[in-house]
Amino acid sequence: MSPSSSSSSWRALVLVAAAVLSFSGHVVVAAAAAGHPDYADALAKSILFFQGQRSGRLPPDQAVKWRSNSGLSDGSAANVDLTGGYYDGGDNVKFGFPMAFTTTMLSWGVVEYGGRMRGRVLRDARDAVRWAADYLLRAATATPGVLYVGVGDPDADHRCWERPEDMDTPRAVYSVSASSPGSDVAAETAAALAAASLALRAADPGYSRRLLAAARDVMAFAVRHQGKYSDHVGGDVGAYYASYSGYQDELLWGSAWLLWATRNASYLDYLASLGANDGVDMFSWDNKLAGARVLLSRRALVNGDRRLDAFRRLAEDFICRILPGSPSSTTQYTPGGMMYKSGHANLQYVTSASFLLTTFAKYMAVSNHTFSCQSLPVTAKTLRALARKQVDYILGANPQGMSYMVGYGARFPQRIHHRGASMPSVAAYPAHIGCQEGFSGYFNAGGANPNVHTGAVVGGPDQHDAFPDERGDYDRSEPTTYTNAALVGCLAYFAGSYRS
């Protein structure tokens, strides 16, 4: 399949010149462009992506037609219903820890920027939140005193290349409890349920109350029974998404969300007892400190609650660590201008940081707040400019001239690391495709994927802005739910600011 031109192209894009630029000792080919991307189109596609990640029985209005029902017996190994939810990336495992973070970030985007989402886009965003929230609610309430945190055998799954509709690898079930605690995954699940309750409160007040009640219970469990889930969960679920930062950040994050959702001062007292910890320069499914501090800054700046100024100052410290030109910056940028944090799925850090920049800028603007990174003055405009540059890079303003969102723009990745996208749909090829047949017939094939996974944001280019577009390169070619989840809010903000 060759890349197809679509309405997602930058409508105002005019290639003015290609120039060889010297930047920090590197040589880069850059394209100058007038106008801006079609943020509204990118927003709609970034949300549509989640339909391609769905597990369970798909609804009649499913728009991604190359997907079908899958994982319909999930949970049966523990005699519970754990159907639904999302596959985290290009495999067929449901990891509760990153799924909960995905839900929290999607919900935060709806809460902050739902007013900038038009019509069906807002409905689709809420549907994406609810698909995950339904699963997390089942995982949190199916068995008293137990939180289910994963379905599927990661090692067995990764030894196969199968469509989710065909998968015949073990669907093991993993959980945490009082005797096998997991404060990290429990507090993140509480954050997700609380955030979703806010995102869905106007649309379905009764459901919102159910989510919040479950969030309270799961947060109490996280505080009462402390420990890292990767130390207690069997199999390799914890190994794939171990909380390397520990669980104090999730306890802070969960408390911050419950403070907002409930307005109960006991959560304020608890998060104050956790203290203000070390500075950080990234925000991810693992380390939530920066996100918690920005979230608490909302109350400090918008509501004038001076008790949270320490968290606001730490949020500013995070920003100073990622701003180009800041004397305290610890962040590398590629020659083409992309924030670079890791060789593995770097764009997850770009989208999460961009969301925090956009959101903190919103709080600054409302309160007429400014601050300084030593000698560098920082305004809301400063933060928005950096966030927009990162989003534009993802959408094609980069040395490759490639959009890293599948289906957006005239040129985008063709061979993403994704089982379902890389194999013919069940509708097109109903016969079962086995574990090893998938590798020989599809994974190792050199052509484009037969299914365009519209809206999927891949791991992204390397530190030199290079992107090989190879299916086997999961570091750069695999999309993840948490990469997209953080981008949704940014795109909603820019779609509302720059109407095409």
Swiss-Prot record:
Glycans are attached at N264, N368. Its EC number is 3.2.1.4. Residues 1-30 form the signal peptide. Keywords: Carbohydrate metabolism, Cell wall biogenesis/degradation, Cellulose degradation, Glycoprotein, Glycosidase, Hydrolase, Polysaccharide degradation, Secreted, Signal. It comes from the Eukaryota. GO terms for molecular function: cellulase activity. It catalyses: Endohydrolysis of (1->4)-beta-D-glucosidic linkages in cellulose, lichenin and cereal beta-D-glucans. One of its GO terms (cellular component) is extracellular region. It holds the Pfam family Glyco_hydro_9. Its main location: secreted. GO terms for biological process: cell wall organization; cellulose catabolic process. Expressed in roots and flowers. A motif (Cell attachment site) lies at residues 471-473. It is found in: Secreted. The active site is at D91 (nucleophile), H417, D469, E478. Belongs to the glycosyl hydrolase 9 (cellulase E) family. This is Endoglucanase 11. It comes from Oryza sativa subsp. japonica. The lineage of its organism: Eukaryota, Viridiplantae, Streptophyta, Embryophyta, Tracheophyta.
